[in-house]
Amino acid sequence: MYQVRRPSRSEFRPVRGLSYHLRVWGEPDPQTPPLVLVHGWMDVSASWQFMVDALSRDRWIIAPDWRGFGLTRHEGPAVDSYWFPDYLGDLDALLDQIAPDRPMDLVGHSMGGNVATIYAGVRPARVRRLVNLEGFGMPATRAAQAPGRYAQWLDEIRDCRQGTKGLQTYDDVQGVARRLMKTNPRLPADKAQWLASQWAAPDADGRWVILGDAAHKVVSAYLYRADEAVAVYERITAPALSVIASDDSLALWWKDRYTLADYQERIRHIPQLQETALPDCGHMLHHDQPVELAQRVEAFLAGA
């Protein structure tokens, strides 16, 4: 089993009608801005542990479980779909609690990188430095796709209500670990075993279930507007670092519908942008190369 170097503690905060779970390392320091880490889709805050362990020094770090993931819980009725603006609202409300008068360093991976980058453009005064780890956004869309997208959304929320969009369950934690290693062949067994115990939990019948709401699998009713994203990027005032993996995830997922060149054309609208690529890693670059990533992130955050 992986041996954690910097143990975290759990805190729960009321955020917009939810009980939000935060994984926290270190203590507040008036001389250092808080470091906020936001995870990707179908992930949890524990995903950051390997990078946190690789940092050269302690600092106050806060990593939330997004709504519908990990230990964050709705306090009202269940939902049948999720909306991207709610992540922005949750982050804004959370920061008002933990650091109301201080800009923060913000690091996001995948969906979390997309949320973090949009937030940095919408609330530029709240972000001191921004790191986007493969937060690509989505392929550009056309207005003509809207009718079909709405119909798809209606079909999928019906499926969700009928219980046909459930997540796979596993016999034991070892089964979850095998699933993680199948998805990411670079993930060693000790890390997979540790992550599995954070990413899933046994249900009342003893089956291990992913700590994620199946409603996250429902497509967004709204089309992704690349031009809107670019308009937000142009308003970012913080220095920003875009980190990509040596493996081309976009080519794997989208083929020629959305390419790395397309992403780079968009992200370069951020006024103060640096770009870097990590060797020998895939989309889960904070698992594959935590030491190298920690070094690059720390160097960037320490910049003048």
Predicted regions, residues:
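Conserved alpha/beta-hydrolase catalytic His-Asp/Glu region
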Residues: 164-223
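Conserved loop-alpha-helix segment in the C-terminal half of the alpha/beta-hydrolase fold
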Residues: 235-281
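Conserved hydrolase catalytic core segment
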Residues: 101-146
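Alpha/beta-hydrolase fold catalytic core
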Residues: 1-35, 56-60, 81-82, 99-102, ...
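Active-site glycine-rich loops that stabilize anionic/oxyanionic intermediates
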Residues: 40-43, 110
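Catalytic histidine-centered segment of alpha/beta-hydrolase-like enzymes
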Residues: 278-290
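A catalytic-pocket lid/entrance helix-loop region that shapes and gates access to the active site
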Residues: 133-169
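Active-site loop/oxyanion-hole signature of alpha/beta-hydrolase fold enzymes
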Residues: 15-18, 23-25, 29, 63-108, ...
